[in-house]
Design a protein with these regions (language model features):
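Sec-dependent signal peptide recognition
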Residues: 2-8
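C-terminal motif of bacterial Sec signal peptides marking the signal peptidase cleavage site
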Residues: 15-17
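Residues immediately within or flanking Cys/His clusters that coordinate Zn2+
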Residues: 33, 51, 64, 71, ...
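Short, cysteine/histidine-rich loop/knuckle motifs that typically chelate Zn2+
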Residues: 37-38, 56-59, 66-69, 76-79, ...
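Cys/His-rich microdomains that often coordinate metals
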Residues: 43, 61, 73, 81
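Polybasic, low-complexity association/targeting segments
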Residues: 92-125, 210, 214
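Conserved phosphate/anionic-ligand binding catalytic regions in large, soluble enzymes, centered on
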Residues: 117, 158-178
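A structural-propensity feature for long, helix-poor, extended segments
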Residues: 179-180, 185-229
């Protein structure tokens, strides 16, 4: 419990550091912005790293992403408040990871696109998986959720385009690694964790780009539900998905999107 309190306090401190008085307004106006969190302008993705200054905390670091007006928001500020999901997930009783994911994506810290999805997918799966287990086999979520958050935060924004590996799909592998206690020296679990990520990446890739963090998160979660049932023998609830945010994505693929319209 101490660790949970520290995470919540830390999230509050980080949010305060990243948000001055004038920044509160943009947060309220752009809680689900599909583009720049500062001005709403379209994002630009560069070919090479350029040193940029975060418009919120003013930290300078290399990045390939900014908006057309030059605004850059670092991953730390972009995901401020993310640690609050620990309390949410500990109180959650659903065995449906899509339901858990939707609750987290509805919070102000989650934007249309962004590296927060690299954490949320794994956290939703871990929570629903644990709820689907018999009481005698339950995990220690108070320890495992912060681990998922820590690992997910290491996957940078734009990994789908710049590394050829969608962070939402990688998050399924993070989830699998945590529940199987996998390490680089493991044998059977090493295979399972990499296979999980590969299956999710395949599903994401088959639907093509441009990226949509919402679509790719849904696809990754649904793939993981089937994978866990087959390989771990644990059955989570699998809900039908119909995205309610398609119109907020300027680069959406329209009728080609498997989770828009009639859903999947």
């Amino acid at each position: 419990m101490k660790r949970i309190l520290l995470l919540v306090v830390g999230a509050a401190i980080l949010m305060a550091a990243c948000n001055g008085k004038k920044d509160v307004e943009f947060k309220q106006q752009n809680e689900m912005s599909e583009e720049c969190l500062i001005c709403g302008a379209l994002l630009k993705y560069l070919d090479h790293d350029t040193v940029m200054e975060c418009s919120l905390c003013h930290k300078r670091e290399p990045s390939k992403t900014c908006c057309e007006n030059g605004h850059y928001v670092c991953s730390e500020c972009h995901t401020a408040g993310l640690d609050s999901i620990v309390v949410m997930c500990l109180a959650e009783r659903s065995t449906d990871p899509i339901e858990v994911l939707e609750k987290m994506m509805s919070k102000p810290f989650c934007h249309m696109h962004g590296p927060e999805h690299h954490v949320l997918v794994g956290a939703a799966l871990l929570t629903a998986y644990n709820n689907a287990l018999p009481d005698s086999l339950r995990l220690n979520l108070a320890e495992d959720l912060p681990e998922v958050i820590s690992r997910g935060r290491q996957v940078p924004g734009g990994a789908c385009g710049y590394m050829g590996a969608c962070g939402a799909a990688i998050s399924t592998g993070i989830f699998m690694s945590v529940v199987t206690r996998n390490t680089p020296l493991s044998t059977d679990s090493w295979r399972l964790c990499n296979l999980m990520t590969a299956k999710a990446l395949e599903q994401v890739a088959e639907n093509g780009g441009p990226r949509c963090c919402k679509r790719d998160s849904y696809l990754s979660v649904l793939t993981a539900v089937d994978f866990v049932k087959e390989y771990l023998g644990v059955e989570m609830q699998k809900a039908k998905v119909r995205c309610s945010r398609s119109e907020m994505n300027n680069q959406g693929i329209g009728k080609k999107c498997p989770v828009s319209g009639s859903g999947m």
